């Protein structure tokens, strides 16, 4: 029996996911072909597999979303068998992103810290659903000069760091050249701190970080008109991540509020883990 493996398409929706960390592979067992996934990321991943079979059948429906735990060596995806004698083959496409895309519930009541040091104040140059680049996106842009220390708004696990880009522009090519740090939270949400400096990360993938911890240095990389910190808290999705509006402690920390465009917010409190 000859099995022809054809890879039609495989792509990563989240650019930080490494093809060295996510591997789909096949093994022969008792005359069957078993497809497995290896996940060496520090985050669970959502994986959608679509198979095209010729003279083969799958034990279960192959078009399925799988939630693969972090640091998994061998997660069974599909079991394929030949239908009759003769040439047989399979091809596949897949999508993969950080986190659990089936998750709909998160901690609505969690209060975030402002993502900078005590005593500093910065304004929001573009708010939730901003008219410039935040249409239908719940993200915030802090007017932050290059070289400013960025602190974690919430504790969690670092799941991605990109810091090798050094340029900025308004061309399409620069949309994928923003440096950033991604931190996953206990409730399944993920925070994205973008446009950090070249080599500006102060944490590494796999690190556990506390609220208020220094995580990066702000910069001006990627698709920008000037230096700023782009912050978004989101739940993952294959086509588009679901940005969330979250509240922050402001002033001396007694007030929790949604941040508004063109307003300045001072952080006069120390972060509490």
Where are these regions (language model features)?
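Bacterial Sec-dependent N-terminal signal peptides
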Residues: 1-22, 37
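Short, hydrophobic/aromatic beta-strand segments
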Residues: 43-51, 152
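Surface-exposed, glycine-biased beta-strand/turn segments
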Residues: 67-177, 270-273
């Amino acid at each position: 029996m000859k099995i022809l493996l054809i890879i039609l398409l495989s792509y990563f929706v989240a650019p930080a996911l490494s093809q060295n960390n996510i591997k789909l592979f096949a093994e022969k067992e008792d005359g069957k072909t078993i497809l497995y996934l290896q996940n060496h990321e520090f985050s669970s991943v959502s994986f959608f597999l679509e198979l095209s079979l010729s003279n083969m059948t799958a034990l279960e429906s192959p078009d399925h979303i799988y939630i693969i735990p972090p640091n998994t060596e061998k997660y069974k995806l599909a079991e394929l068998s030949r239908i009759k004698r003769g040439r047989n083959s399979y091809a596949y496409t897949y999508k993969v992103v950080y986190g659990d895309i089936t998750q709909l519930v998160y901690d609505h009541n969690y209060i975030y810290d402002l993502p900078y040091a005590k005593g500093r104040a910065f304004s929001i140059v573009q708010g939730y659903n901003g008219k410039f680049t935040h249409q239908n996106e719940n993200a915030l842009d802090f007017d932050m000069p290059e070289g400013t220390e960025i602190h974690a708004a919430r504790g969690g696990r670092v799941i991605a760091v990109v810091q090798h880009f050094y340029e900025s522009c308004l061309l399409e090519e620069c949309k994928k050249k923003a440096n950033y740090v991604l931190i996953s939270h206990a409730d399944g949400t993920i925070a994205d701190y973008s446009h950090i400096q070249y080599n500006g990360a102060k944490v590494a993938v796999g690190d556990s970080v506390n609220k208020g911890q220094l995580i990066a240095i702000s910069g001006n990389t990627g698709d920008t008109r000037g230096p700023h910190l782009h912050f978004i808290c989101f739940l993952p999705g294959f086509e588009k991540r679901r940005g969330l509006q979250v509240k922050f402690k402001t002033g001396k920390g007694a007030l929790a509020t949604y941040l508004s465009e063109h307003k300045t917010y001072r952080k006069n409190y120390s972060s509490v883990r």
